[in-house]
Amino acid sequence: MDELSETQVMQNETATAVLPLLNGESQSFNLQKHLKYLTKMLDPLPSPFTVLDASRAWMVYWELSSLAILGKLDSSVCERAISSVRQLKGPSGGFCGGNGQDEHLLSTYASILSICLCDSTDAYSLIERDRLYDWLFSLKNPDGSFRVNNEGESDARSVYAAVCVSSLVGISMDDPLFEGTLQWLCKCQTYEGGLSGVPYAEAHGGYTFCALAAIALLGGLDNLNEIKLSTWLVQRQDPALYGFSGRSNKLVDGCYSWWVGASHVIVASGYGSASHKSLPNLFYNPEKLLGYILQCCQSTSGGLRDKPPKRPDQYHTCYCLLGLSSIAYDYRYHTSDGWSYKPSILHSSLSSLLPAHPIYCVPFGFEERIKSYFLSQESSKF
């Protein structure tokens, strides 16, 4: 008998942990336990969390996003968040990962989404748009991509971050800032159909979302092979465990319910294509995905996780909740009216969740209010 590969061993171990839960007593969405977990994460964190010092901006966003998608984000939490994000402001217009650190494009993305969620003039005023614009230009590469900082890497995450935050603060997608960016992103589509972090690398669920969302904002979805992309996205749902994986021959992970799930929504909605033609339904089984998240990703003490037997964390709580929102509603995009959504057939199981914008990763409405604010502000740059 042939020896099993490491991949096969890990898949068997995952199935052994997942299947008893998947086939066990039916679980409902446990709102109160998740709120208890999120409330606890607002307390001072113990010393092991010091390893996440450079992820402060992200921890603020994950907390705010989770509370917001549950409709439980209040002004007192926003005031604390504004104070925290203010300490992360850098000298050039970007935001840092932690206090006193260098500005970083991904930390800037997380900080601006947090500002968006705080939904107030006090929060919006933390963004110095003209300085941010100059800083983004300083990170631009000749090939159209963006570095995360002056000496950092360039990939689909950093490009999406640049495009996304620019869109939120009123920088046009036709601005010279994005010359060559769409072309660079489209080179990231692989022979499998998904998109990679950089051209000619392996397709990945997280990078696919980042590249696809940026391409959609730039209006270039027609440049992709959508049939191959859709096929690859369908293949991300495990046929036995029903969760999504991030790559071929990789394990299911609750966070991909958003990275892959939102990618399905973008493609099906028609947003970012010339025709804006929407499809009648998604290409995967949302009911089975719901089962995986509710049965296997909910911790008994609250919060959500990658997969059993792992512990819950802020990252997976945030993106599992966003993933659940993506199946709680049917999303469409209309040229004249913009985005619309209505409860899906699964909504009754997830009625405490608000609809999430598949591009901006915040509940609908927040993105429009920050855009309106910056459209009313004068700029010397554009």
Curated annotation (Swiss-Prot):
Residues the record lists as binding (2E,6E)-farnesyl diphosphate: 204-207, 247-250, 256-259
The enzyme's E.C. designation: 2.5.1.58
Enzyme class at the top of the EC tree: transferase
PFTB repeat residue intervals: 78-119, 129-170, 178-219, 226-268, 286-328
Required cofactor(s): Zn(2+)
Gene3D superfamilies in alphabetical order: 1.50.10.20
Catalytic activity: L-cysteinyl-[protein] + (2E,6E)-farnesyl diphosphate = S-(2E,6E)-farnesyl-L-cysteinyl-[protein] + diphosphate
Amino-acid positions noted as binding Zn(2+) in the UniProt annotation, renumbered to this chain: 253, 255, 316
Site feature Important for selectivity against geranylgeranyl diphosphate, where: 58
Function: Catalyzes the transfer of a farnesyl moiety from farnesyl diphosphate to a cysteine at the fourth position from the C-terminus of several proteins. The beta(cpp1) subunit is responsible for peptide-binding.
Record's protein name: Protein farnesyltransferase subunit beta
